[in-house]
Amino acid sequence: MPKVVSAKILLKFRRFDMDIKEIKENARERMKGFCNLCRECDGVWCAGKVPGMGGTGTGNSFKIAHDKLKNIKVVMRTIHSAKNPILETSLFGEKLSFPAIVAPITGTVFNMGGYVSDEEYSNDVVLGALDAGTIAMIGDTGDPKCFEHGINAIKKANGKGIAIIKPRENDEIIKRIKIAEEAGAIAVGIDSDGAGLVTMKLFGQPVGPKSVEDLKILVNSTKLPFIVKGILSVEEAILCAEAGVHTIIVSNHGGRVLNETLAPCEVLEDIVKAVGDKINVLADGSVREGVDILKYLALGAKGVLIGRPIIWGSVGGRQEGVKIILETLKNQLYQSMILTGCDNVNNISSKTIIK
């Protein structure tokens, strides 16, 4: 007689595939007091929660980034031949399944509630992104172990990751660039808008603005593509181009460093017109669904960064959750392209949107 296995044992070992609803429910429970996972992630509930998940001050920079992006509308078109849109693209010499990269985020305890450690989070995002056919950026903070955890995750991914470093003294940045190079990272850079970051002050870590000469030194210190994240003006985009920067990211740091800034989507088009033929331009800011990616591409970005939803993925479903978040965004982008007549992510025009 075959041994009868109880239903309880079967349920214990059975693998249930997660979905977005389950991931978000898990994350909401595990991030109580830090993130409410609001139906509309608009920065209202979490305003002023820095450290935490919100925007600094009254939270207006977060709110503006959300509101301005939502005010951009897409033009629906259904009489066309774009039946099977191409989502694949190449960034930093890597073929990606769609033009989205995981943003650099650290501080799981004081920003996210601590359900996952910084080490676990780094592994989740780097490997989860790889599972989804794209790449993740790892971040830097006052605790040196955070950067170390990110570097170790990049090593596990055979170098498929990007190291973004706080705007420390140049010698400290270069030291970390060399560590990233040894790990096989595909690109390195700084988030220049971290120059006044509150969380760095908590650790007594000196950060500050960079001159064009500083940028030139950093660019020339490595053979890897060099990125500057946190550009919000045409003037600074031009300075980055003059310094030989490979890629800029139009970003207001999720509204977490300076209140009352412009939204990234407000300045993106002008920046692309000014430097888009010289350097790569990516953007971030309130990307919550696939149609948001479409909007940024229509404004001229070559790709976007995904921030807060990736946190939900890690906290709510770990590595698999990150993969599911990214694949959901990819599927939504695919559908949005069909319904707007866009056949390739590399040639989405401004005619796709109305500002």
State what each model feature region is.
Residues T106-S117, A163-D171, P225-L232:
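Active-site mouth loops of central-metabolism enzymes
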